[in-house]
Every structure is written in C-alpha cells, then in structure tokens.
Amino acid sequence: MELNIMTTIKGMHAELIKDYFFSALDRKKYSAFDGKKKYNLNIIGVRNNSHDSTKFDDLLVVIYRGEDLEWIVKSYEITTDPGPSILRKPINEKGTAILVPAQYRSTWKIGPHGKTRYIALAQRLGKVKVFRDDDKDTKLEMDERQIDEGFFGINIHKHASSYEREFVRGASAGCQVFKSTKGFNDFMELCHISADLFGNSFTYTLLEEDDLK
C-alpha cells in the first residue's frame, strides 16, 4: 500500500491504512495506540529500501483518532538517515549515528532543538540504539556489530531552510528530518494537541519498508 507524500486521509481509506500499519506493528510485537481516545498519536517512520543518504525518500506516518473519534492518517516526506556530508565527517569519534529500527516507548518530548532552539520532538526521555557508520563514505552501513545505545539527541525536526529542500546534505546527523517546513509545522501542531491530553511524552516506531509487506 502506497501513501502520497504530505497527505491527510480520513474515513474508510484511513481505517484500511490503519489496519495495514497496525498489522505490521503486531508482527513485530510492537504496541499500537488503538483505544477510543482522540489524538493518541501513533508516530511511525518507514525507512526506504534504497538507503539513499542524499534524499528525503523515507516516510513519517501519524495514525490517530480525530475529534469525532474516526481514524485519520497523515504522512510526511522525511529522511531517517544521516546526510552525506555528516557521513564523510562524523561528529562522533565512533562514527555517524543511524537509528536502529525499533519501537522506542516514551522517548521523545516537545523541546528545543539545535543552535536556534526552535521547538521539535527531542530525544530526552529515553535511550535509543544507533548503528555507528565509521568508514567516512556516503554509503549507509548498518552493521549489527556496531550498535551504540544512549542519549544521542536523535531528534525529530525540520531542516534549516524555510523552503522544501530536495537534498539532505548536512540537514541530518542521524535525526529524523522533515523535507517540508510546512509538513513539520503541521506535525508539531498535532504533537502539541496530544501533549495537552496525554502529557509531554511520545513513542516513535521506526520500521523498514519490508516490514510492511
């Protein structure tokens, strides 16, 4: 099942997509927030099989119940990978961070990101696992023998430009980064509504494209 980029789906189609993603979560033994509560967000990243570090070719999907408790699905174009300029010059001596696909429960909160301290989802509440790519080329290396765990600031944020950006370049050092500022702002609006209802704590699940087959 394919989703268009930066789209909102409601009604029967949203219910079908919800079932499709929740089945994938169930196969991985991950939790899904499917109770009858509005704005209880399922935030799911999908890493493209191409593993292209140069492009925003991954997907972030948010599945939740709206005001009328009907299911809504929103999707956004992102990268789940570090950009090529960071891969060439890692900021950590162990190598560049690449988030390991998993479900990370209650690990992010709304908080400041980066030098400009704008508001994003910040990894402040729990540890994550990352692959360490230390060969300083632009090919993504996801070696299970080189996994690091800790607080690495793997945030969910936008890139620095105000316009939609085509290439990642240095926009991601392992964070989950939106291609579109408009999409990011839409996503953060949902997060603020959810935080008012459930508290400032967010679960993020990163899947691989093959997990949905």
Spans of features found by a protein language model:
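Cell wall/extracellular polymer interaction/catalysis modules
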Residues: 1-169, 183-192, 198-202, 209-211
